[in-house]
C-alpha cells in the first residue's frame, strides 16, 4: 500500500485493511515521502500535517506498528534521492545504471540520510531498514536499487551512525511506546517534536537547513542521546540550544523551567 491505507480504493472498491480482519500493519510510504520531501526543502509543518493525518486515520495500534521506511526494493535508494539534482532523473537508463554521486553531493546526501534515519527511528512505528541503506548503497529505480550488499566496502561512518540509532531506540521505551506531539511554526527548516512516556520526555530537533538554528527547550538539563552532549539551564527561562546546520539532537530532558 503506497498511500494512506485507511481509505485505499483499488479496482473501484474501498479496501477495509484496518477493519480488524485483514492487516495489522502496512509499509509506511507516506512517512518515507514526507521525510524525503522535508529534507529536500519541504517545511516542517507539512511533515507534521502528514503524520497527524495518518494518526487521525489509523487505529492507534496500527499507527504504533507501522513499518517505518525510507527505502524499499520498489524505490530509488534514499542516499541517491537525497543527493541527486532534478536533472539527474532525466539521464538515460544506461547513465542511471552506472551513476554515482560526485563527492560534494555525496557528503550532502550523507548528512541528509543521517537526519532521515533519526526521524525514522524516533517516530511511532517499527524502523525498517532496506538492506544496504545503512552501508551507503546508492542506486536509482529498480533494478539499480537492488544491487547486492557492499560487503567489505560499507560506508563505516553511516554504518556506525545506524548502529548508534539502533542502540538508542532499543534502550528507550519512550521512543517505542511514548506519545507524540509536534511543535512547529518556529522555523520551516526546524522539525521539532516530543515523545513522552510517564515522566520521561525526549525532544527531537532536526535542522535540515545549511545554517544553524537557535531554539528554546523547557528543561533544566538535557542530554543528547546520540552524542552524550549535555545542555544546562542558565536561567529560569529554560535551555537555549543552537542546532548546527544539517544536524539532529535527541534530547532527554529533565526538569521544567518556571
List each language-model region with its residue ranges.
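Active-site-proximal helices and loops of the catalytic beta/alpha 8
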Residues: 1-66, 119, 136-164, 195-198, ...
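Residues at the C-termini of beta-strands that transition into short coil/loop
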Residues: 4, 30, 70, 226-229
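Aromatic/acidic polysaccharide-binding cleft in carbohydrate-active enzymes
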Residues: 15, 68-101, 117-156
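Short loop/turn segments at secondary-structure transitions that flank enzyme active sites
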Residues: 33, 75-76, 257
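Aromatic-anchored helix/helix-loop segment that forms the rim or "lid"
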Residues: 44-52, 88-113, 171
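Structural motif
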Residues: 57-64, 106-114
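Carbohydrate-interacting/catalytic domains
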Residues: 109-110, 122-129, 133-258
Amino acid at each position: 500500500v503506497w498511500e494512506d491505507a485507511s481509505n485505499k480504493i483499488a479496482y473501484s472498491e474501498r479496501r477495509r485493511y484496518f477493519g480488524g480482519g485483514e492487516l495489522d500493519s502496512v509499509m509506511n510510504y507516506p512517512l518515507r515521502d514526507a521525510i524525503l520531501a522535508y529534507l529536500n526543502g519541504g517545511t516542517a509543518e507539512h511533515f507534521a500535517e502528514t503524520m497527524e493525518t495518518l494518526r487521525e486515520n489509523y487505529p492507534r495500534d496500527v499507527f504504533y506498528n507501522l513499518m517505518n521506511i525510507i527505502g524499499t526494493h520498489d524505490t530509488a535508494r534514499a542516499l541517491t534521492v537525497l543527493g541527486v539534482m532534478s536533472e539527474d532523473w532525466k539521464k538515460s537508463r544506461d547513465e542511471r545504471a552506472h551513476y554515482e554521486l560526485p563527492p560534494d553531493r555525496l557528503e550532502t546526501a550523507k548528512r541528509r540520510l543521517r537526519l532521515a534515519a533519526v526521524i525514522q527511528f524516533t517516530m511511532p512505528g517499527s524502523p525498517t531498514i532496506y538492506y544496504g541503506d545503512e552501508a551507503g548503497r546508492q542506486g536509482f529505480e529498480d533494478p539499480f536499487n537492488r544491487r547486492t550488499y557492499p560487503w567489505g566496502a560499507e560506508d563505516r561512518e553511516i554504518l556506525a551512525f545506524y548502529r548508534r540509532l539502533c542502540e538508542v531506540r532499543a534502550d528507550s521505551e519512550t521512543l517505542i511506546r511514548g506519545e507524540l506531539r509536534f511543535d512547529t511554526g518556529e522555523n520551516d527548516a526546524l522539525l521539532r517534536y516530543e515523545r513522552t512516556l510517564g515522566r520521561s520526555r525526549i525532544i527531537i530537533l532536526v535542522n535540515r537547513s545549511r545554517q544553524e538554528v537557535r531554539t528554546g527547550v523547557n528543561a533544566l538539563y538535557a542530554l543528547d542521546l546520540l552524542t552524550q552532549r549535555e545542555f544546562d539551564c542558565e536561567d529560569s527561562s529554560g535551555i537555549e540550544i543552537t542546532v548546527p546546520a544539517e544536524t539532529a539532537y535527541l534530547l532527554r530532558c529533565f526538569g521544567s523551567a518556571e
